[in-house]
């Protein structure tokens, strides 16, 4: 019962109007079909009276045919008018829906604009840019430090390899010379023996410099 007293919305009114226009269009089409049948019947009657030589009957039937055809022509005009009204109703409905959508969008945009402070938004973007730059600088410093550590480690390894190589060469040379030297008592060798069999500090330093080790 509540639905009977419910106030119709604009959409409901438009739907009812479209329904009514469609009903009128169907009625016009039925009337035109009936007029076309009558038109054919009159044409047949006129031909029949003409064959019978009844001129008066032919004139009367011819007048009826003219009136009927005029009436049929009017049905086309009315049908065109109904179609135009239906089209206008559809356009009006589309415009109303568009207006409703625009109204909803405008309200949403208005609510968003109220919550968004341009000054705060600008400040937030500036803070983000500042912090992003800090992060990039920190990352760059960390990368540079790691590169220095790895480079220093590689240099140290290369230097150690060179020193080991020199010591190995010196050790081999010393072993060779020590093998040829006469064995002494368990005491220290004499100065002349050390000079003839050992390698001096100058010799070691010269070989280190030759290998690029300061």
Curated annotation (Swiss-Prot):
It is found in: Cytoplasm, Cytosol; Late endosome membrane. Residues 178-214 are annotated as: Disordered. Keywords: Coiled coil, Cytoplasm, Endosome, Membrane, Protein transport, Transport. One of its GO terms (cellular component) is ESCRT III complex. It is a peripheral membrane protein. Gene3D superfamilies: 6.10.140.1230. It holds the Pfam family Snf7. InterPro entries: Snf7_fam. The keyword Transit peptide does not apply. Residues 25-55 form a coiled coil. GO terms for biological process: endosome transport via multivesicular body sorting pathway; late endosome to vacuole transport; protein transport. The keyword Transport applies. A motif (MIT-interacting motif) lies at residues 202-212. Belongs to the SNF7 family. Probable core component of the endosomal sorting required for transport complex III (ESCRT-III) which is involved in multivesicular bodies (MVBs) formation and sorting of endosomal cargo proteins into MVBs. MVBs contain intraluminal vesicles (ILVs) that are generated by invagination and scission from the limiting membrane of the endosome and mostly are delivered to lysosomes enabling degradation of membrane proteins, such as stimulated growth factor receptors, lysosomal enzymes and lipids. Probable core component of the endosomal sorting required for transport complex III (ESCRT-III). ESCRT-III components are thought to multimerize to form a flat lattice on the perimeter membrane of the endosome. This is Charged multivesicular body protein 2b-A. It comes from Xenopus laevis (African clawed frog).
């Amino acid at each position: 019962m509540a639905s009977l007293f419910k106030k119709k919305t604009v959409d409901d009114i438009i739907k009812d109007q479209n329904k009514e226009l469609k009903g009128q269009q169907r009625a016009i089409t039925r009337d035109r079909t009936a007029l076309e049948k009558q038109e054919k019947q009159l044409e047949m009657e006129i031909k029949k009276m003409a064959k019978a030589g009844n001129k008066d009957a032919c004139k009367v039937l011819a007048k009826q045919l003219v009136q009927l055809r005029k009436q049929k022509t009017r049905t086309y005009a009315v049908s065109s008018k109904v179609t135009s009204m239906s089209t206008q109703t559809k356009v009006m409905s589309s415009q109303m829906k568009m207006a409703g959508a625009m109204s909803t969008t405008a309200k949403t945009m208005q609510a968003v604009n109220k919550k968004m402070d341009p000054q705060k938004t600008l400040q937030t973007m500036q803070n983000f840019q500042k912090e992003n730059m800090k992060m990039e600088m920190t990352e760059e410093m960390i990368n540079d430090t790691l590169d220095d550590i790895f480079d220093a480690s590689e240099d140290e390894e290369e230097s150690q390899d060179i020193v080991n190589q020199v010591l190995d060469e010196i050790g081999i040379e010393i072993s060779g010379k020590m093998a040829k030297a006469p064995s002494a008592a368990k005491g220290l060798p004499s100065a002349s023996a050390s000079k003839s069999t050992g390698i001096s500090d100058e010799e070691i330093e010269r070989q280190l410099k030759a290998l690029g080790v300061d």
